[in-house]
Amino acid sequence: AIIGAANSLIRHNRDRFPVEGVPIRRDADPANPSLVVFDGEKTEKESLAWFVKALLHLHKAGRGWEEFAVLYRSRQSSRAVEEALVRAGIPYRVWSGVAFYARREVKDSLCYMRMLTRGDDAAFLRTVNSPKRGFGPKKADALKVLAMREGISYYEALKRHIDEKPFNTKAIREYVAVIEKARASAAARKVSDVFNLIMADSGYEASLQLSGEDERLNNLAELRQAIANYESDADDPTSLPEFLQRASVFAEDIGEQKGPAMKLMTIHAAKGLEFPVVFLWGFSEGIMPSSRTSTMEEMEEERRVCYVGMTRAKDLLILCHSQGTSEASTFRYPSRFFFELDRNLVKLVRPLEPGLEESAKEALMYKDKFLTGEPLESSSWRPGDHVRHKVFGDGEIIAVAKSGAMTIRFPTLATPRTLMAGAPLERISTAGAPTVADSSFSGAPVPEPSAEPGVKDQK
């Protein structure tokens, strides 16, 4: 079923003659064939809960941890998976890459936040010259001598001697001013606000933008999402020290783990490898394929990448999709590649929501016109229009992109959502017209994960 499903996908490529895979395993059990499973959840939190439940179920049934692999399109997608595995106590290793909380930009950002609480020497040395402020090894050595002699931290020594050479430079003074300003307000702010403040005022995020390091910016966005998830999950207002304590658990080094462990890696790193059980994570439009896909040629390459990911599985392939990363995140449809698969070869964990497939295909049709360069009909939607969505309720359009995608503010959600062109919307009133009263959330209740993951043991 896995090879058959992958072949049904790659047949949609037109520019190159598709090379289809042929099942050649001699040890395959005809009574227990390979299986393709699709799991679609409302939120990433629910998707992770089902993922962990499926892992534990399969492990209890006899699967060793070394038999599992999680593959993803890009490295930033590993963050949520790593956190879920740490919480569940499931051993894993990140192959051909670095664990999320060990990545440079993530460690730098967390150290900036640590400077607002403890101001420890390790956090100071990591942040004082990131971005570059002319604080090299000579200045660091001179500061260490002062700190040791006076029995204080490096940062306190810097503040005490800020008017002396070689520390009295404009850039170093600005660093101290940024830390002191953020410290003064951190206790009264949400963690997410503190993070945004320190990233902006320190110039750290801007330095990544100027460098063009998209992957590092994506990891920074993932850390921002982790903070938002932490705040939404907490019953009480969270403090910065509490968040840093939680992050430290995920940041512990797991590289020296001994014994069997799951493998996490990008699809690119998995080329040439095979695993008994594969979870293809982020099987959502905008992730797989990437939202940056702008031509049909690029879309065909995305399809080939997906084909490679699918064919890494020997016994069981699980395609994991969630409509959003949180209750307030951007709405996502399942990957277009899901709709291209031979559905006779795919087992659904639960039925698709009524109307989801039709609305997704309508939106994807509009995107395909954009990819092929066909003239797009001028969007009838304008900022200020009031609309009704069958799941999110009533909202107001606040922006319309050239591609037709719309950013909509729904009173029932904490932040605006971006919906693809062609999303099923009912017009309530046009921009400038009187609006109706905000309606309450009218979406169907989210189904609870089943008692069992709905996946038969595959050996």
What positions do the PLM features span?
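Well-ordered alpha-helical segments embedded in enzymatic catalytic cores
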Residues: 47-54, 108, 222, 305
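Conserved RecA-like helicase motor-core motifs
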Residues: 89-99
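A generic "binding-loop/recognition-motif" signal
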Residues: 74, 97, 131, 269, ...
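Flexible glycine-/small-residue-rich
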Residues: 37, 72, 266-269, 282, ...
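Conserved helicase C-terminal RecA-like lobe
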Residues: 64, 78-84, 88-90, 103, ...
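Active-site-adjacent beta-strand anchor residues
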Residues: 71, 95, 102, 281
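C-terminal accessory regions
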Residues: 148, 282-415, 421-452, 457-459
